[in-house]
Amino acid sequence: MPKLKTRKAAAKRFKATGTGKFTRRRAFRNHLLDHKTPKQKRHLATKAVVHETDELRVVRMLPYA
């Protein structure tokens, strides 16, 4: 059986944790930050865990993660 290819775009966006879950960046932190509160921006700076309904998609894109 041939080796499975990793989706490079996904590999740059998701990181596997020790427990097998995946972390991701939060949206809404690239531009238009003037009107957002510092608390909001701090919250957006933290990593989020990929939701369980999307986890299978990420696993398929990253077969060796």
Swiss-Prot record:
Carries keyword Plastid?
no
UniProt keyword Kinase, yes or no: no
- List UniProt keywords, sorted A-Z: Ribonucleoprotein, Ribosomal protein
**Record's Pfam families?**
Ribosomal_L35p
Q: Which one of the record's GO molecular function terms can you name? A: structural constituent of ribosome
Entries under SUPFAM superfamilies matching the protein: L35p-like
A single GO cellular-component term from the record reads:
cytosolic large ribosomal subunit
Q: Name one GO biological process term.
A: translation
- Name the InterPro entries on file: Ribosomal_bL35, Ribosomal_bL35-like, Ribosomal_bL35_CS, Ribosomal_bL35_sf
Q: Read off the NCBIfam families from this record.
A: rpmI_bact
User: By what name is this protein known?
Assistant: Large ribosomal subunit protein bL35
Organism of derivation: Parasynechococcus marenigrum (strain WH8102)
